[in-house]
């Protein structure tokens, strides 16, 4: 089961079990409608948490979970990550994709010959960088329009006309 990080529980608020969550998603408004999460220090050891009440304020989500009704119980959740399954991810608008959907995608050069395969996506301060496995080497390509001409999700390929410049 693939799990995807949506937020991190920072600390409790008040005495009734409310927790402050840092959203790590482009869709923080989904915290208002999502009814459950899988919570844990990692995606390998998670437990289900059902949401009783949710609100958003100043860039944070504030959540009450079923069975978490004291400060002590809420403190035990501090530092845990909130995950959802892939089927629960928000649909992306046309022309957009989740980063994990790009892993394994073919990279074509300007002549439309296969040059490599995306093996990872690195998050850098300015933009993401595609790590491409090509002929046993790792090639890093900035994820910007200047270098990436086309991404075809249906065909599972990306066109990088200036690929040779990265060799």
Curated annotation (Swiss-Prot):
Record GO biological process: ribosomal small subunit biogenesis; rRNA processing
Family matches, as InterPro entries: PRC_barrel-like_sf, PRC_RimM, RimM, RimM_N, RimM_N_sf, Transl_B-barrel_sf
Keywords: Chaperone, Cytoplasm, Ribosome biogenesis, rRNA processing
Subcellular localization: Cytoplasm
Family membership noted in the UniProt record: Belongs to the RimM family.
Domains: entry comment: The PRC barrel domain binds ribosomal protein uS19.
Residue ranges constituting the PRC barrel domain according to the UniProt record: 94-166
Function: An accessory protein needed during the final step in the assembly of 30S ribosomal subunit, possibly for assembly of the head region. Essential for efficient processing of 16S rRNA. May be needed both before and after RbfA during the maturation of 16S rRNA. It has affinity for free ribosomal 30S subunits but not for 70S ribosomes.
A GO-annotated cellular component: ribosome
Organism expressing this protein natively: Chlorobium phaeobacteroides (strain DSM 266 / SMG 266 / 2430)
Keyword Secreted attached: no
Pfam family, any one: RimM
Gene name, Swiss-Prot/TrEMBL: rimM
Cytoplasm recorded as keyword: yes
Origin: domain of life: Bacteria
Major subcellular location class: cytoplasm
A molecular-function term among this protein's GO annotations: ribosome binding
Subunit composition and interactions: Binds ribosomal protein uS19.
Bilayer-crossing regions: none
Protein name, as recorded: Ribosome maturation factor RimM
